[in-house]
């Protein structure tokens, strides 16, 4: 009887209408037990649904708490089919030996394109003119309508999205400056500035592209808004906690800022049927969108394929490359032999105990990979065919002090049968 679980026995649960590309990739790689639901699940229903599930895929609404993770008796990996992973308690997942994967760059182009579109819309005052036309008005005027060419775009956070945005903006003739906490290689003629205040005071439009951290909470408040040029615009397509929306509403209502575009909010509806409330509602110079910056068909297709591939690679060969909460190991499959993975607390002596267990059974180690972080160690162990010693060795590895979990990925002469 093989030690590893065959792929047709591995259960995959995908929530929140994960893209078809993920389902296709799982099925093309031999995973036939794939269930996909359109909705997010609350904690109690999620616990029930996770019984017997090996891999879980979610987007942004399903919340994976420590309580849920500890109740998932068979869960080996989580895929966040999104850029962020705020919906998962990452430390809790690591403590129970569950790596979490995401797609940090797959929607970069989509967010950058939306930002460019919003810059043009704000500078031309298209939104209020469109509303007026729908209401029967005819506001044909050049007053307050400006070209973007020659204007200064200030980018806060010069990462993947910020740098992509700078390329698009420069192609349209904009001058681009950026502020980042770390040194970044600049693209084209983009110029870094030393402080956030300098960027705010110099920009005709400011676009925010920073992560959600304690340092970025309300980083744009009343003081920072006063630092911005009179008549400037603000765009936030990053995280909802970055801007004090009450302060922004005041700056817009007073006329200090000419306009704003906001795609993310501190509190967002849990579903498309829930009511959305914001202090920015009713302001004609504000473009409000329902967190759709990365929601294009192309981005969702890329995200589906990228996250599914990472889950498959972990299940098939033990690769944790791209996991956000786990030691990073990337390695190919071997055509023969047996591959074990051993997740343990990062304490002295575990690797010695693992090797001693293998030696006691007279099994030869062909290759061994170890990576650690401050809390967790991850060993991938490649051995000769273990034969009848496999079950006993597996039991001994589970008995190693500090062990979190042990699995066999493939065994005997059946490579990657899982």
Residue map of PLM features:
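Rossmann-like dinucleotide-binding domain for NAD(H)/NADP(H)
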Residues: 100, 222, 231-334, 361, ...
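An N-terminal-biased, well-structured beta-alpha scaffold segment characteristic
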Residues: 1-101, 199-201, 221-223, 227, ...
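Short glycine-/small-residue-rich Rossmann-like dinucleotide-binding loops
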Residues: 61, 204, 209-212, 238-239, ...
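Phosphate-binding beta-alpha-beta segment of Rossmann-like dinucleotide-binding domains, i.e.
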Residues: 96-152, 164-171, 319-323
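A conserved regulatory-domain signal marking ACT and ACT-like small-molecule sensing domains
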Residues: 321-418
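Rossmann-like dinucleotide/phosphate-binding beta-alpha-beta segment
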Residues: 141-230, 246
